[in-house]
Every structure is written in structure tokens, then in C-alpha cells.
Amino acid sequence: MLIISHDQVADPKIFMNEVFNKTQEQVSLYAIHYTLNEANNKINYGCNFLNRVLREDTLLYSEDNRLKQLGSYLYHPEVFLRIQKHWNKRFEHARYFEEKSTICEDNPSNQGRYLILQQAIQQACLGLIYVFWEYQSSYYSLPYLLHLCEQFSDVPKIIYPKRSFQSQQMYSRLCHAQYNLNEKIQENPSESDSLKAEHLTYKFIQAARKEADKKLEELKKLHLKN
């Protein structure tokens, strides 16, 4: 995570691409960015994500002490309800997209199915990240979201590619579904491959639900107790 005093690298996508290119494609970073003003404003209003990360993680470098003092983690029933509502809405979206991918059509679009499945996985990831971290990402790349989820869960392993070419191709199609649909208009993945991706997505969403339910039970005890 970077907290910076200016806006030049506010967009994590640009920064991550620059690092990737300047290291001859040897290093991939998955960065969370705040400007100094954003961070200080959030700390003022009791941001549990920043309070947790800045308190628990290792500080690699700090230029000065312009970042405000952290408060304590905020436990409150209303905080729990906010987390629970956020998860329920994300899970609702994930199930919606996943169910839409199963509709039988006379003229199916397998490229379109990958895009729908990508949306389903993204929504489940965004929900998990909020449940575990209370963080709302402003960047929605599938590899990025899966990597964030990997910091607290093994669920991304369901989606990550295995050694086979078919598995790696399926993962690539899920990650680049929007680009493929717009740019590779002549390419038509097989229906059997897209159905396998659909099955993986279903497994991922169900596993994410179990992880979220377990974490929500823990959070409920903490927030209601305090």
C-alpha cells in the first residue's frame, strides 16, 4: 500500500504497469493507493481498514510524519450491519451473473458467457475483500482482486490456472473477457470450455459464501460484544 502526497500515481493501474514494464516484465505489483489527504480524511472518520493495515503491517519507508495518528478499531453493531449488507448485495450480484450464464439459448455467445462469469467472480471478490478488510477497491482487474483475496483466503486457488494449457487458457479468457469480446471478434471458444469455466465460477462463489459466512459470524460476536 502506498500513501502519497500528490495525485500523479493515484491510479494503481498506471503505476503497476510502469513497474511491470521497467522490470522487463519480471515483477508484478498489486498496489493499493491513497493520497495523503484521502488517508488522513479516512483516519479522521474512523477507517477500520487503514487502522488495521497501518497498525499491523510492516512499514517499509516513510518520508515524514504527515500521516495523522491512528485511532482504535471501531467495534459497533452498525459497523457489522454495514459489512453484512455489503456482502449480501455483492453475493446477490454474483449469483445473478452466475445464473445468467446458465441460461440455455438458441444462439449462445461463449465469449459473452466468459464476460458474465468474470462479472460474477469480481462481485464475489469485492464482497470478500469488504468482509475481511472493510476495503472497497477502485480497481477491478480480476487478477488484482483475486490477489487481494489470496491474502486472507484460499478460495482464489479454485480460479487460478493449473498446469494444463486448457486451464491456463480458461483463466486467461476469464481475465481478459472484455478485451476478447471487443477485439477478438472472430474467436469463438468452445461451448464445453465455457461450461467448465461456468462450473469453476459456481464452485468459487459457493466457497466464497462459506468463507464470508464464517467471517461474518466472528465479526458479529466482536461487534455486538463491544
Task: Identify what each model region corresponds to.
Residues 2-7:
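Short beta-strand-to-loop capping motifs
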